[in-house]
């Protein structure tokens, strides 16, 4: 069962990723919003390169995804990663709705979970590692602020390894939304939904799977049977780097209050909240964020190796 890249004049797949795909070697997609908007410089560029190295160490090829000069890129050079990291907020945050406009204007864009999934699927990449998915924001019953990531998971056939939804979100409503749209929520060696900085939450996953092989098999069966759409693989942050629930909850509640007072909304909301939580925790949340991304990259690479070995 081979996955071929879709021919697209706006898609540029790097030579390393092209060679891997043509030779049926495992590839793991990575997003770029975390580089431009999720972490400060220079931690962002250092982390991005560490994540790529972690994937290589575990037998797969990394494909960091972004829009560069109006081209969708699957596989970035170190120079391109450093460019996104330095420019930070000057880089447009790009989800599904934004892609055609950023491409048409020849601009640069940092891809969210949703747009990274889209470009990964075009390139023939089936698995993607990130920190946390977007979801239903707190207060969404008034604002209807729901991340486009959730709709993308319902229709684009890419598995996303994450530490759950970002803990700044309403985790209960996020799980309900995923259930409504038929998106499997897999807990890796856990029955409880991880809450990004914390290993557990009051909410449950749909199913617990304890090995990369089991997850790879579930991916293959889902898509072989014609069931389109993604899967969420929720991987708890390593215990030494997990944050106390009381500390992170207090910081999140304050950050959310401030976002409401300052009328921060839309695509600016998540970067604002993450940055403010980092400030309120004295940088502890940034350290935890880096470690959970590395942990997710390692698991994604192991799943990718199993998937390619058995099903490609």
UniProtKB/Swiss-Prot annotation:
Top-rank taxon: Bacteria
Binding residues for Mn(2+): 145
Instruction: Give the protein name, as stated in the record.
Output: Pseudouridine-5'-phosphate glycosidase 2
Q: How is the cofactor bound?
A: Binds 1 Mn(2+) ion per subunit.
**Organism, scientific name:** Photorhabdus laumondii subsp. laumondii (strain DSM 15139 / CIP 105565 / TT01) (Photorhabdus luminescens subsp. laumondii)
Q: What class of enzyme is it?
A: lyase
Q: Name one GO cellular component term.
A: cytoplasm
Binding-site positions, substrate: 93, 113, 147-149
The UniProt gene name for this protein comes to psuG2
């Amino acid at each position: 069962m081979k996955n071929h890249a879709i021919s697209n004049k706006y898609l540029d797949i790097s030579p390393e990723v092209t060679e891997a795909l043509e030779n049926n070697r495992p590839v793991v997609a990575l997003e770029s919003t975390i580089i431009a908007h999720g972490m400060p410089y220079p931690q962002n560029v250092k982390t991005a390169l560490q994540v790529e190295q972690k994937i290589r160490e575990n037998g797969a090829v990394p494909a960091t995804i972004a829009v560069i000069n109006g081209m969708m890129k699957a596989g970035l050079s170190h120079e391109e990663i450093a460019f996104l990291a330095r420019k930070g907020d000057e880089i447009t945050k790009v989800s599904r709705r934004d892609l055609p406009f950023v491409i048409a204007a020849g601009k640069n864009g940092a891809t969210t979970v949703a747009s990274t999934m889209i470009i990964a699927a075009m390139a023939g990449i089936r698995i993607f590692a990130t920190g946390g998915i977007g979801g239903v924001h707190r207060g969404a019953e008034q604002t209807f602020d729901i991340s486009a990531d959730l709709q993308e998971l319902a229709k684009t056939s890419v598995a996303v390894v994450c530490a759950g939804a970002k803990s700044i979100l309403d985790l209960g409503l996020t799980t309900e939304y995923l259930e409504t749209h038929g998106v499997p929520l897999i807990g890796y060696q856990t029955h409880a939904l991880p809450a990004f900085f914390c290993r557990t939450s009051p909410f449950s996953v749909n199913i617990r799977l304890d090995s990369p092989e089991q997850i790879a098999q579930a991916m293959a069966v889902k898509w072989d049977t014609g069931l389109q759409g993604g899967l969420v693989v929720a991987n708890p942050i390593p215990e030494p780097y997990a944050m106390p629930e009381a500390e992170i909850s207090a910081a999140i509640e304050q950050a959310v209050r401030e976002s409401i007072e300052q009328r921060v909304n839309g695509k600016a909301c998540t970067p604002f909240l993450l940055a403010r939580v980092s400030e309120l925790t004295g940088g502890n949340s940034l350290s935890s964020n880096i470690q959970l991304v590395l942990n997710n990259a390692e698991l994604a690479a192991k799943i990718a190796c199993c998937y390619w070995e058995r099903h490609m």
